Amino acid sequence: MSAAPADGTTGAIPAIDWQGQPITRARCAACEHAALRAGGGCEPGHSCMQDAYARRIDRFFRSHRALANDHLDHAYFEVRAIAARHADLFHLPPLMSDPDETVRLQVALRVPQRLLRAMRDDPHREVRIRVAHRIALDDLAAMADDPDYQVRAIAAQRLPVAALPRLLDDGDLQVRLQAARRVEMPALWRLQDDPAPEVRRIAAQRLPAAGLCRLAHDPDWTVRWEVAGRADAPLLTGLLHDVEPEVREQAARRLRLAAAGLEAQHG
């Protein structure tokens, strides 16, 4: 006959520990935190740091933050990760080199900037992504060369505008798009040469209206459509003969609006 569960219930997620063993009444009685249960401070299947289910572990440490420091070296990575979320900051540095990235993710969210710098080269991309979101701008520049495109894209979102032109040559489209949305003149002209129409559309949206002549002949019709939405009258006249009906309609609409505006001005 198997041992009875400590809570006597049969929930959708059973109360088992990280090694797959049921959390029985006997296990609860032998637990180092048995006194907490006697006072209603924990409950198997709901709030228990011995459980394999992360949400139950988190409930335990939310109620007993002072105990988090004592479980940062637990054998189960979820316990270490959740304890790191609640532990005192000065206990976290050893976990910067924890073997599990889930733990290091939590550490990257909390350690001060002087320590975060050392995590820029973490072997796991998700950790570096967290670091890139938090790290001081002076230390972020080195992450613009990260092997992962998402880290570089975050750098393109956060770095000072003056540091963005080199990211316009990035091999990943998402990085170039982030840089294209923020870069200023004269680097803005370079967007016209990008191989991706998505970037050239941004050029058509951001370049001065007087500088759209080249893009009016872009091979991608969506770029020409953007041009037709902003160009001055002389360029619009040429776009009335575009091979794509959407571009012609956009150019004709703009010219009608311009003509109506002139009529209103002159009565």
What is each model feature region?
Residues 1-93, 97-101, 221, 225-267:
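N-terminal alpha-helical scaffold/docking segments in eukaryotic complex subunits
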Residues 70-78, 97-102, 121-126, 145-150, ...:
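Short coil turns that connect the paired helices of HEAT/ARM alpha-solenoid repeats
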Residues 78, 90-91, 102, 106, ...:
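Structural detector for tandem alpha-solenoid helical repeats, activating at a conserved register
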Residues 85, 89-161, 165-169:
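A generic tandem-repeat structural signature
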Residues 155-193:
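Aromatic-anchored, glycine/proline-accented short structural segments
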Residues 190, 214, 238:
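Conserved beta-strand positions that form and line the central face of beta-propeller blades
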